[in-house]
Amino acid sequence: MGAIVLVALMALVASSSAFSDIEHNIMKLEGENIISSSSTPNDDQSSFSDGTSDMVESLFLNSGNRNLVLMMLSGRPQPNGRCIGDAQPCGFLVSDKGCCDPNYCSEYSKGKCICVPKGQPCGLLHFCCLDLTCDGYFNGTCK
């Protein structure tokens, strides 16, 4: 059953027009955990000088309970203003660009680039706004 879920998920990602040029890397880890990551290089270069890509899409599946545990779309600062700014539409149905740091996309497929303000919950996928830090890795507060 786990193999069927993985095949269906990979077919969905591979058939998406936004991901047609994406390189897929699949790694088998300890036990039944599978990590799949994809990246799309810039139009004019394959990656930035620091090796980061224009867009990163990560999936983490645990076939023990067959739940999608983590689905993340994140962006990095990009040269020439090629990232998506504050409160602008984002997600794989909207653009192949990621949000400018420290913003993240509020929804995987169609959201807005936002950051977590002071005093609000933050963590691994919910980044604090500039000049703020999260006091916990998974469950923290922006200070």
UniProtKB/Swiss-Prot annotation:
Superkingdom per UniProt: Eukaryota
Does the keyword DNA-binding belong to this entry?
A: no
Q: Which GO terms describe its biological process?
A: defense response
Q: Has the keyword RNA-binding been applied to this entry?
A: no
Give the main localization category.
secreted
Compartments where located: Secreted
- Which residues are processed away as propeptide to yield the mature protein? 19-80
Q: Which tissues carry this protein?
A: Expressed in trichomes, that are stiff epidermal hairs located on the surface of petioles and leaves.
Leader sequence segment: 1-18
Query: Which keywords label this protein?
Result: Disulfide bond, Ion channel impairing toxin, Knottin, Neurotoxin, Plant defense, Secreted, Signal, Toxin, Voltage-gated sodium channel impairing toxin
The chain's disulfide connectivity reads C83-C100, C90-C105, C99-C113, C115-C129, C122-C134, C128-C142
What is any one of the record's Gene Ontology cellular component terms? extracellular region
Q: Single GO molecular-function term?
A: sodium channel regulator activity
The free-text domain note is: The presence of 'disulfide through disulfide knots' structurally defines this protein as a knottin. This toxin contains 2 'disulfide through disulfide knots'.
- Protein's job: Plant defense neurotoxin that causes pain and systemic symptoms in mammals via modulation of voltage-gated sodium channels (Nav). Potent modulator of human Nav1.5/SCN5A (EC(50)=55 nM), Nav1.6/SCN8A (EC(50)=0.86 nM), and Nav1.7/SCN9A (EC(50)=208 nM), where it shifts the activation threshold to more negative potentials and delays fast inactivation. Also shifts the voltage-dependence of steady-state fast inactivation of Nav1.6/SCN8A, but not that of Nav1.5/SCN5A or Nav1.7/SCN9A. On Nav1.7/SCN9A, principally acts by binding to extracellular loops of domain IV (Nav site 3).
Q: Give the UniProt family note.
A: Belongs to the urticatoxin-2 family.
* Name of the featured protein: Beta/delta-urticatoxin-Uf2a
Q: Per the UniProt entry, what species is this protein from, by scientific name?
A: Urtica ferox (Tree nettle)
